[in-house]
Amino acid sequence: LYYGGTGSDSRNLSLPEKGSSRFEVGSPDTASIAALGKAIELTQPRAEEDLLHERKLLVKLRDGLSNIEGVRILGEQPLENSVGILSFVCDRYRSEELGMILDEDFDIAVRTGYHCAPLVHDLIGSVEYGGTVRVSMGRFTTETEVQALVEAVKELMEE
């Protein structure tokens, strides 16, 4: 393991024992810090409106998928504790296969797999599906897009 070379004492191969340099090796990513500030500035005035929009879409998606035989929604929470993200599995498909079909045949983008949390899938029972299909909705997601996803999954599960 190699380490050392700080912004305050570049020739010293030991990490500092005191101060912020102990935890912050290298230069701060000022461009990302500035971008984060701008993102907050742009989204903050609409935050409540965006959250309500996401929750409306979430209800539409949850209601639509829950009526399809063989689809299991994971991690359902009370709406007031939810954001525009929903994970599900289908008993006829592994998550990667379903994601690929949705992409190639329906032009719908979802995230599939273990989502950087492989051990959680043992707990939620999605290992046999190769993880989950995760849908993320935001400001620019439309009800039409959510309905298209529901209809695509329904069509695939009825084949």
Predicted regions and their residues:
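Pyridoxal 5′-phosphate
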Residues: 1-159
